[in-house]
Amino acid sequence: MNNNYHTQINRPNMLNEIAANNNLLNNKNNQTNQLNNNQYNNQYNNQNNNQNYPQNYPQNSQQNFQQNSQQNHQQNYQQNYPQKFPHQQNNITEDLVDIELSDSKESGSEYPQSVQQTHQQPIQNNPSIPNNQPNQINQYNQQPNQYNHQQPNQFTQNQPNQPNQPNQHNQYSQHNQPNQSNQPNQYNQNNQFAQPNQYNQSGQLNHTNKINKQIQKQLDKNQPEKIPSKPEKNQKQSHKPKLPPTMQHGPLPIHGMPIQHMPPQLPMQTEYCKKSNSLFDYIIIPIALVLVFLFLVHPKTFQNNW
Protein backbone atom coordinates (compact mmCIF):
# COMPACT_ATOMS: atom_id res chain seq x y z
CA MET A 1 0.00 0.00 0.00
CA ASN A 2 2.74 2.43 0.88
CA ASN A 3 4.64 1.90 -2.34
CA ASN A 4 1.53 2.38 -4.45
CA TYR A 5 0.65 5.56 -2.53
CA HIS A 6 4.04 7.17 -3.13
CA THR A 7 4.19 6.19 -6.76
CA GLN A 8 0.77 7.68 -7.41
CA ILE A 9 1.76 11.02 -5.88
CA ASN A 10 5.15 11.31 -7.59
CA ARG A 11 3.91 10.16 -10.98
CA PRO A 12 2.67 13.59 -12.26
CA ASN A 13 5.93 15.30 -11.27
CA MET A 14 7.96 12.68 -13.07
CA LEU A 15 5.80 12.99 -16.17
CA ASN A 16 6.26 16.77 -16.17
CA GLU A 17 10.01 16.44 -15.93
CA ILE A 18 10.11 13.90 -18.76
CA ALA A 19 7.98 16.14 -20.95
CA ALA A 20 10.18 19.15 -20.21
CA ASN A 21 13.29 17.20 -21.08
CA ASN A 22 11.77 16.02 -24.36
CA ASN A 23 10.79 19.58 -25.28
CA LEU A 24 14.27 20.85 -24.56
CA LEU A 25 15.87 18.11 -26.64
CA ASN A 26 13.57 18.82 -29.58
CA ASN A 27 14.23 22.56 -29.38
CA LYS A 28 17.96 21.99 -29.17
CA ASN A 29 17.96 19.75 -32.24
CA ASN A 30 15.81 22.16 -34.26
CA GLN A 31 17.60 25.40 -33.29
CA THR A 32 21.15 26.35 -34.22
CA ASN A 33 23.79 26.10 -31.54
CA GLN A 34 23.60 29.75 -30.37
CA LEU A 35 23.15 29.19 -26.63
CA ASN A 36 26.02 28.84 -24.24
CA ASN A 37 26.05 26.32 -21.44
CA ASN A 38 25.01 28.94 -18.87
CA GLN A 39 22.11 30.18 -20.99
CA TYR A 40 21.01 26.59 -21.64
CA ASN A 41 20.99 25.77 -17.93
CA ASN A 42 19.09 28.95 -17.07
CA GLN A 43 16.44 28.22 -19.68
CA TYR A 44 16.06 24.64 -18.42
CA ASN A 45 15.69 25.77 -14.80
CA ASN A 46 13.20 28.50 -15.67
CA GLN A 47 10.93 26.08 -17.54
CA ASN A 48 10.94 23.64 -14.65
CA ASN A 49 10.20 26.38 -12.12
CA ASN A 50 7.34 27.79 -14.20
CA GLN A 51 5.73 24.38 -14.59
CA ASN A 52 6.15 23.13 -11.04
CA TYR A 53 5.96 26.13 -8.67
CA PRO A 54 5.63 29.48 -10.43
CA GLN A 55 3.99 31.09 -7.39
CA ASN A 56 7.02 30.58 -5.13
CA TYR A 57 9.44 31.95 -7.71
CA PRO A 58 7.76 34.84 -9.54
CA GLN A 59 11.12 36.14 -10.69
CA ASN A 60 11.54 32.97 -12.79
CA SER A 61 8.24 33.35 -14.59
CA GLN A 62 8.03 33.36 -18.35
CA GLN A 63 7.45 37.12 -18.60
CA ASN A 64 10.54 38.00 -16.59
CA PHE A 65 12.57 35.50 -18.58
CA GLN A 66 11.53 37.17 -21.83
CA GLN A 67 12.32 40.64 -20.46
CA ASN A 68 15.76 39.57 -19.26
CA SER A 69 16.53 37.96 -22.59
CA GLN A 70 15.55 41.15 -24.42
CA GLN A 71 17.73 43.29 -22.18
CA ASN A 72 20.70 41.00 -22.66
CA HIS A 73 20.20 41.08 -26.40
CA GLN A 74 20.14 44.90 -26.38
CA GLN A 75 23.32 45.08 -24.36
CA ASN A 76 25.24 42.53 -26.41
CA TYR A 77 24.09 43.61 -29.87
CA GLN A 78 23.68 47.24 -30.87
CA GLN A 79 20.38 47.86 -32.57
CA ASN A 80 19.76 50.39 -35.31
CA TYR A 81 18.44 53.37 -33.36
CA PRO A 82 19.05 57.10 -33.93
CA GLN A 83 21.39 58.98 -31.60
CA LYS A 84 21.21 62.76 -31.63
CA PHE A 85 23.86 65.24 -30.60
CA PRO A 86 24.38 68.95 -31.42
CA HIS A 87 26.83 69.84 -34.15
CA GLN A 88 28.59 73.23 -34.02
CA GLN A 89 30.26 74.91 -36.94
CA ASN A 90 31.11 78.61 -37.45
CA ASN A 91 29.64 79.46 -34.01
CA ILE A 92 26.14 78.48 -35.24
CA THR A 93 24.31 75.59 -33.66
CA GLU A 94 22.92 73.56 -36.52
CA ASP A 95 19.98 71.26 -36.26
CA LEU A 96 20.42 67.97 -34.50
CA VAL A 97 21.97 65.37 -36.75
CA ASP A 98 20.62 61.84 -36.73
CA ILE A 99 23.24 59.11 -36.69
CA GLU A 100 22.41 55.48 -37.20
CA LEU A 101 24.66 52.88 -35.65
CA SER A 102 24.87 49.36 -36.96
CA ASP A 103 26.95 46.24 -36.55
CA SER A 104 27.91 46.05 -40.21
CA LYS A 105 31.57 46.83 -40.97
CA GLU A 106 30.98 48.61 -44.25
CA SER A 107 32.39 51.78 -45.71
CA GLY A 108 31.33 55.19 -44.44
CA SER A 109 29.13 55.92 -47.45
CA GLU A 110 25.99 55.17 -45.44
CA TYR A 111 26.62 58.10 -43.07
CA PRO A 112 25.60 61.62 -44.15
CA GLN A 113 28.25 63.93 -45.51
CA SER A 114 27.99 66.39 -42.63
CA VAL A 115 28.82 63.61 -40.18
CA GLN A 116 31.72 62.34 -42.31
CA GLN A 117 33.27 65.81 -42.29
CA THR A 118 33.10 66.05 -38.52
CA HIS A 119 34.77 62.65 -38.15
CA GLN A 120 37.50 63.49 -40.66
CA GLN A 121 38.38 66.94 -39.27
CA PRO A 122 39.97 65.86 -35.96
CA ILE A 123 42.03 63.28 -37.86
CA GLN A 124 43.32 65.94 -40.24
CA ASN A 125 44.11 68.38 -37.44
CA ASN A 126 45.87 65.82 -35.30
CA PRO A 127 49.44 67.13 -34.59
CA SER A 128 50.86 63.63 -34.97
CA ILE A 129 49.67 63.49 -38.63
CA PRO A 130 51.53 65.92 -40.92
CA ASN A 131 48.80 68.07 -42.35
CA ASN A 132 48.66 71.85 -42.75
CA GLN A 133 44.91 72.23 -43.18
CA PRO A 134 43.34 74.77 -40.79
CA ASN A 135 40.92 73.58 -38.18
CA GLN A 136 37.46 74.97 -38.82
CA ILE A 137 36.18 74.10 -35.38
CA ASN A 138 39.08 75.78 -33.58
CA GLN A 139 38.93 78.96 -35.63
CA TYR A 140 38.73 81.08 -32.48
CA ASN A 141 42.03 79.67 -31.28
CA GLN A 142 43.74 80.72 -34.52
CA GLN A 143 42.66 84.35 -34.16
CA PRO A 144 45.20 86.61 -32.49
CA ASN A 145 44.55 87.66 -28.95
CA GLN A 146 42.97 91.08 -28.95
CA TYR A 147 44.51 92.05 -25.66
CA ASN A 148 48.01 90.75 -26.37
CA HIS A 149 48.48 91.55 -30.09
CA GLN A 150 46.07 94.17 -31.32
CA GLN A 151 46.01 96.57 -28.37
CA PRO A 152 49.32 98.25 -27.53
CA ASN A 153 50.57 98.07 -24.00
CA GLN A 154 49.82 101.35 -22.28
CA PHE A 155 52.59 100.98 -19.76
CA THR A 156 55.34 100.13 -22.23
CA GLN A 157 54.45 102.33 -25.24
CA ASN A 158 56.52 105.45 -25.91
CA GLN A 159 58.20 105.49 -22.52
CA PRO A 160 61.97 105.92 -22.82
CA ASN A 161 64.21 104.55 -20.07
CA GLN A 162 61.45 102.53 -18.52
CA PRO A 163 63.63 100.51 -16.09
CA ASN A 164 65.03 103.76 -14.60
CA GLN A 165 61.60 105.23 -13.93
CA PRO A 166 59.94 104.68 -10.57
CA ASN A 167 57.32 102.02 -10.33
CA GLN A 168 53.97 103.62 -11.16
CA HIS A 169 51.87 100.85 -9.73
CA ASN A 170 53.75 100.73 -6.46
CA GLN A 171 54.25 104.46 -5.99
CA TYR A 172 52.08 104.38 -2.89
CA SER A 173 53.91 101.40 -1.50
CA GLN A 174 56.08 102.23 1.49
CA HIS A 175 58.63 99.55 0.68
CA ASN A 176 59.56 101.17 -2.67
CA GLN A 177 60.14 104.66 -1.27
CA PRO A 178 63.79 105.74 -0.96
CA ASN A 179 65.35 105.70 2.50
CA GLN A 180 62.26 104.46 4.22
CA SER A 181 64.20 102.90 7.07
CA ASN A 182 65.74 106.29 7.95
CA GLN A 183 62.39 108.06 8.14
CA PRO A 184 60.74 108.49 11.55
CA ASN A 185 58.18 105.94 12.54
CA GLN A 186 54.81 107.38 11.58
CA TYR A 187 52.76 104.65 13.15
CA ASN A 188 54.32 104.96 16.62
CA GLN A 189 53.70 108.69 17.09
CA ASN A 190 51.03 108.11 19.70
CA ASN A 191 52.95 105.31 21.37
CA GLN A 192 54.40 106.73 24.59
CA PHE A 193 57.01 104.03 25.00
CA ALA A 194 58.29 104.29 21.42
CA GLN A 195 59.33 107.95 21.62
CA PRO A 196 62.67 108.49 23.36
CA ASN A 197 62.82 110.40 26.65
CA GLN A 198 59.22 111.56 26.62
CA TYR A 199 59.03 111.89 30.39
CA ASN A 200 62.49 113.33 30.80
CA GLN A 201 61.84 116.14 28.31
CA SER A 202 58.92 117.49 30.32
CA GLY A 203 60.58 116.72 33.68
CA GLN A 204 57.49 115.14 35.23
CA LEU A 205 59.09 111.80 36.01
CA ASN A 206 62.10 113.29 37.83
CA HIS A 207 59.83 115.56 39.87
CA THR A 208 57.71 112.65 41.08
CA ASN A 209 60.81 110.71 42.11
CA LYS A 210 61.98 113.59 44.30
CA ILE A 211 58.61 113.85 46.02
CA ASN A 212 58.57 110.13 46.78
CA LYS A 213 62.03 110.28 48.34
CA GLN A 214 61.02 113.17 50.62
CA ILE A 215 57.93 111.30 51.82
CA GLN A 216 60.00 108.22 52.65
CA LYS A 217 62.44 110.30 54.71
CA GLN A 218 59.60 111.80 56.77
CA LEU A 219 58.15 108.38 57.45
CA ASP A 220 61.52 107.06 58.59
CA LYS A 221 61.90 109.94 61.08
CA ASN A 222 58.46 109.39 62.62
CA GLN A 223 59.07 105.69 63.22
CA PRO A 224 60.92 104.81 66.50
CA GLU A 225 64.35 103.29 66.25
CA LYS A 226 64.38 99.55 66.62
CA ILE A 227 66.68 98.44 69.48
CA PRO A 228 67.96 94.88 69.20
CA SER A 229 66.56 92.73 72.01
CA LYS A 230 69.16 91.40 74.46
CA PRO A 231 68.90 87.84 75.77
CA GLU A 232 67.87 87.43 79.39
CA LYS A 233 70.28 86.02 81.94
CA ASN A 234 68.05 83.09 82.86
CA GLN A 235 67.86 81.91 79.26
CA LYS A 236 70.64 79.50 78.38
CA GLN A 237 72.41 80.33 75.19
CA SER A 238 72.94 77.42 72.85
CA HIS A 239 76.55 76.73 71.98
CA LYS A 240 75.77 74.81 68.83
CA PRO A 241 78.04 75.56 65.92
CA LYS A 242 76.46 77.70 63.24
CA LEU A 243 76.15 75.92 59.93
CA PRO A 244 76.40 77.78 56.64
CA PRO A 245 73.06 78.51 54.95
CA THR A 246 73.79 76.00 52.20
CA MET A 247 74.22 73.14 54.70
CA GLN A 248 71.24 73.87 56.94
CA HIS A 249 68.80 71.95 54.77
CA GLY A 250 70.90 68.96 53.88
CA PRO A 251 73.67 68.38 51.34
CA LEU A 252 74.24 70.48 48.28
CA PRO A 253 72.15 69.57 45.20
CA ILE A 254 73.85 67.65 42.42
CA HIS A 255 73.82 69.16 38.95
CA GLY A 256 70.74 67.96 37.08
CA MET A 257 69.12 66.41 40.20
CA PRO A 258 66.22 67.89 42.19
CA ILE A 259 66.91 69.46 45.57
CA GLN A 260 66.00 67.13 48.40
CA HIS A 261 64.85 69.13 51.41
CA MET A 262 66.03 67.15 54.43
CA PRO A 263 65.67 68.05 58.12
CA PRO A 264 68.74 69.41 59.90
CA GLN A 265 71.01 66.66 61.20
CA LEU A 266 72.03 66.82 64.88
CA PRO A 267 75.57 65.87 65.96
CA MET A 268 76.10 62.29 67.10
CA GLN A 269 76.10 61.77 70.89
CA THR A 270 78.56 59.08 72.04
CA GLU A 271 78.12 57.54 75.54
CA TYR A 272 81.25 56.37 77.39
CA CYS A 273 81.34 53.79 80.23
CA LYS A 274 81.69 55.14 83.72
CA LYS A 275 84.95 54.47 85.56
CA SER A 276 84.58 52.10 88.55
CA ASN A 277 87.08 52.24 91.43
CA SER A 278 85.42 49.68 93.71
CA LEU A 279 87.07 46.35 94.76
CA PHE A 280 83.98 44.43 93.76
CA ASP A 281 84.68 44.86 90.05
CA TYR A 282 88.38 43.97 90.21
CA ILE A 283 88.60 41.18 92.90
CA ILE A 284 85.31 39.46 93.72
CA ILE A 285 83.96 39.02 90.20
CA PRO A 286 87.12 37.34 88.79
CA ILE A 287 87.33 34.91 91.75
CA ALA A 288 83.67 33.90 91.25
CA LEU A 289 84.27 33.23 87.57
CA VAL A 290 87.27 30.99 88.35
CA LEU A 291 85.30 28.92 90.86
CA VAL A 292 82.43 28.41 88.42
CA PHE A 293 84.88 27.26 85.79
CA LEU A 294 86.47 24.75 88.15
CA PHE A 295 83.28 23.18 89.52
CA LEU A 296 81.36 22.95 86.26
CA VAL A 297 83.88 22.59 83.48
CA HIS A 298 86.67 20.58 85.15
CA PRO A 299 85.27 18.61 88.09
CA LYS A 300 87.90 15.85 87.74
CA THR A 301 90.75 18.23 88.18
CA PHE A 302 89.07 19.70 91.24
CA GLN A 303 88.73 16.25 92.89
CA ASN A 304 92.26 15.19 92.16
CA ASN A 305 93.65 18.34 93.66
CA TRP A 306 91.72 17.91 96.88
From Swiss-Prot:
Record's signal peptide: none
Residue ranges, compositional bias (Low complexity): 119-201
Coiled coil: 13-39
GO cellular component annotations of the record: membrane
Protein name per Swiss-Prot or TrEMBL: Uncharacterized protein R335
Entry keyword set: Coiled coil, Membrane, Transmembrane, Transmembrane helix
Residues annotated as transmembrane: 279-299
Stretches with biased composition (Basic and acidic residues): 218-235
Location of the protein in the cell: Membrane
Domain of life: Viruses
Annotated membrane topology: Single-pass membrane protein
Region of interest called Disordered, as start-end residue ranges on this chain: 44-76, 103-204, 216-249
